[in-house]
Every structure is written in C-alpha cells, then in structure tokens.
C-alpha cells in the first residue's frame, strides 16, 4: 500500500506483485547502468591518461599501469582469467576502447542469473553495437564479458578487456 497526497486528497494505491516486480527490475537495471557507466568512465580515464603520456613521450611504467588497471578489474569485473585482456597484454588503444560519452544503452535483458546490456557505440568514427554481460559475484553485479557486432561478417566478436 502506498500513500501519496495530490491536491490535498490522500489516495491509497494498492499495487500488485507484478508492479512491484517491475519496480524492482527498474531499480536493478538502474544499478547495472550505474556499474556500466562507472566502468566505462574509469577505463576511459585509464586509457586516455596512458595515451597522453605516450603522446608526450613520458611513458608511465607498466607496473603503475597494471596496478591501476588491476584496481579497475577488481572493482568491476568477474574474477576469472583473461588471457588476452589488457592486463595480460598491456595494450593501450587510441582512441580509448571504452568511452561513456560515445555509448547509449538501448536494451537491458535479464537471462537467468545474468543480465545483458546492449548499447549503440561510436568508436573511431564508426557505429557499432556492444553487448555487456553481467553476472552476480559476491552479491555485486560484475562485468563478465564484452562483445561487439561486426557488420562486415555479421557476427559478435569478443572485446578483450
């Protein structure tokens, strides 16, 4: 039961379980959006900072880059080996792979114990779509993998994070 005041009249609203579930879903999806946007921002800052140092000819030591990246991984990614990931291969892309200003979430879908976020992306002047798959780990939603659609071959390909 919810009470609210409208034009000095108290209304009682009885909400069904379905509506409550929808509200819970909206809260969960907002949480996923927040996690994704924070991850995108931190990855963007990490890669942008590394690129600025490369351009200036003052490279940051790999140990410092790895430590900062590991902190981002620990905060946002599921705990699993990423053999081709940025942490293992120490790759820095230009422009940065992830940029929250160039992504727009278009769909959030729950599938069993995971949630998939689909977004439209503008990367290096090209439009693409990405799928971000989240899993719950230790009670927190963490990013498990990222795929990008290749319009050339019509397939989804993994982005190494």
Model region roles, listed by residue range:
Residues 32, 107-116, 123-129, 137, ...:
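Low-complexity, intrinsically disordered terminal/linker segments enriched in charged
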Residues 10-11:
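Tryptophan (W) side chains
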Residues 68-125:
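Surface-exposed, charged secondary-structure patches
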Residues 3-4, 14, 19:
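Short hydrophobic targeting helices and cationic amphipathic motifs
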Residues 28-50:
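Short, aromatic-enriched amphipathic alpha-helices that serve as compact interaction elements
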């Amino acid at each position: 039961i919810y009470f609210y005041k409208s034009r000095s009249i108290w209304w009682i609203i009885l909400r069904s379980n379905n509506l409550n579930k929808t509200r819970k879903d909206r809260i969960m999806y907002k949480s996923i959006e927040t996690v994704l946007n924070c991850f995108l921002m931190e990855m963007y800052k990490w890669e942008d900072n590394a690129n600025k140092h490369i351009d200036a000819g003052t490279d940051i030591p790999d140990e410092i880059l790895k430590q900062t990246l590991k902190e981002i991984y620990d905060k946002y990614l599921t705990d699993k080996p990423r053999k081709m990931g940025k942490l293992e291969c120490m790759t820095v892309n230009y422009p940065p792979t992830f940029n929250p200003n160039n992504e727009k979430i278009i769909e959030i879908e729950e599938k069993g114990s995971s949630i998939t976020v689909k977004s439209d992306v503008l990367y290096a002047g090209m439009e693409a779509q990405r799928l971000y798959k989240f899993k719950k780990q230790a009670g927190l939603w963490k990013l498990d993998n990222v795929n990008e659609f290749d319009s050339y071959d019509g397939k989804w390909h993994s982005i190494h994070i």
